[in-house]
């Protein structure tokens, strides 16, 4: 079971639609650690850390997001795991 860390930037209609709260719920359901926050440019940034398969599943979810979101692009950058604990909304 490989532990991985993915740094995401999510673009589209992703603020004001419950994206962060929904991502937190999905992450906790999957057992993925990390954080999510809104950025001033209207995008959402997230760091996901955990079992590779579960992180991949949450990245897949991020391409869709919650029902009111309209995701146009997701950028993923793979990084070294840093030992995130829990999943939180920051900023």
From Swiss-Prot:
Annotated ranges, domain Acylphosphatase-like: 5-91
Temperature dependence: Optimum temperature is 98 degrees Celsius. Poorly active at 25 degrees Celsius. Thermostable up to 100 degrees Celsius.
Keyword RNA-binding: no
Pfam families: Acylphosphatase (PF00708)
Catalytic site positions: 20, 38
GO MF entries: acylphosphatase activity; hydrolase activity
Recorded superkingdom: Archaea
pH dependence: Optimum pH is 5.3 at 25 degrees Celsius.
PROSITE patterns linked: ACYLPHOSPHATASE_1 (PS00150), ACYLPHOSPHATASE_2 (PS00151), ACYLPHOSPHATASE_3 (PS51160)
UniProt keyword terms in alphabetical order: Hydrolase
Family annotation (InterPro entries): Acylphosphatase, Acylphosphatase-like_dom, Acylphosphatase-like_dom_sf, Acylphosphatase_CS
Reactions accelerated catalytically: an acyl phosphate + H2O = a carboxylate + phosphate + H(+)
Similarity comment: family membership: Belongs to the acylphosphatase family.
Official protein name in the record: Acylphosphatase
Organism of origin: Pyrococcus horikoshii (strain ATCC 700860 / DSM 12428 / JCM 9974 / NBRC 100139 / OT-3)
Gene, per the UniProt record: acyP
């Amino acid at each position: 079971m490989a532990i991985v860390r993915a740094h995401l930037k999510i673009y589209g209609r992703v603020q004001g639609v419950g994206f962060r709260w929904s991502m937190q719920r999905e992450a906790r359901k999957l057992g993925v650690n990390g954080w999510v926050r809104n950025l001033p440019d209207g995008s959402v940034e997230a760091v996901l850390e955990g079992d590779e398969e579960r992180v991949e599943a949450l990245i897949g979810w991020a391409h869709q997001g919650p029902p009111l979101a309209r995701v146009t692009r997701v950028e993923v950058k793979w990084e070294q795991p840093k030992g995130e604990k829990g999943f939180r909304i920051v900023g």
